[in-house]
Amino acid sequence: DGLRVDAVASMLYLDYGKNDGQWVPNKFGGNKNLEAVEFFKHINTLILGRNHGTVMIAEESTAWPKVTGKVEEDGLNFSYKWNMGWMNDFLDYMKLDPYFRRDNHHKMTFAMSYNESEKYILVLSHDEVVHLKCSMLNKMPGLEGDKFKNLMAGYAFMMGHCGKKLLFMGQEFAQKQEWSEERELDWYLLENPEHKKIQNWVKELLHLYRRNRCLYELDSMQTMQTEASSALSERARMARIICSLSSISHR
């Protein structure tokens, strides 16, 4: 199906994680790893050219330009770029008690300021549910019932945001424990109505996404309003969808 290439920045920069005297500049005197650049261009062109539907995803944490740009435009030709900025802002926001979110809506809208720079994929990955970072469910604030509701709201926002979507296994039914390669997922949780509800919610969101082409065709959206107490966004495509993140009912 494809590859997610980890730590791309460490390959693109000769001085990545190194001090002065620990690296040698390229032939132009710069810090770009020219061989790595050509390797990515070649391998992405080769794989994407041979296999229709295959994706190549770059986990790249810097502002390197045209990660998903075409080779003819001096891009690296990846299918998508891992949107780490969105992920960090999203998780920081969702961890907050709803009372304090009104002053932090910028965390949910900032990704739109750079959305057009690359083809992004929104990811809640294995990296975020290991090493005492807690499962997605246990990142949510409040009592257990509140955690489920917050997680449902977060997934809905993610599905309506620009960019392709990717959940790590177990997140679709609110796995409680952190992920470990030494054990399987806690499938027995699906016998619990709340966990089954989350699974059905994710299924309905995916069906909604696939039924509405305006949610995925152009991946373009504009923020209409970012007041402290609300956040409204509009996806400007073949259809108009307005998302209101507020406790006030709108008609």
Describe the predicted segments one by one.
Residues 1, 39, 43, 154, ...:
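Alpha-helical packing segments of well-folded alpha/beta enzyme cores
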Residues 2-14, 168-173:
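Short acidic/histidine-rich active-site segments
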Residues 19-181, 189, 210-216, 220, ...:
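Conserved alpha/beta catalytic core and glycan-binding cleft of carbohydrate-active enzymes
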Residues 185:
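Active-site beta-strand/loop architecture of penicillin-binding DD-peptidases
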Residues 193-219:
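Catalytic cores of secreted or luminal carbohydrate-active enzymes
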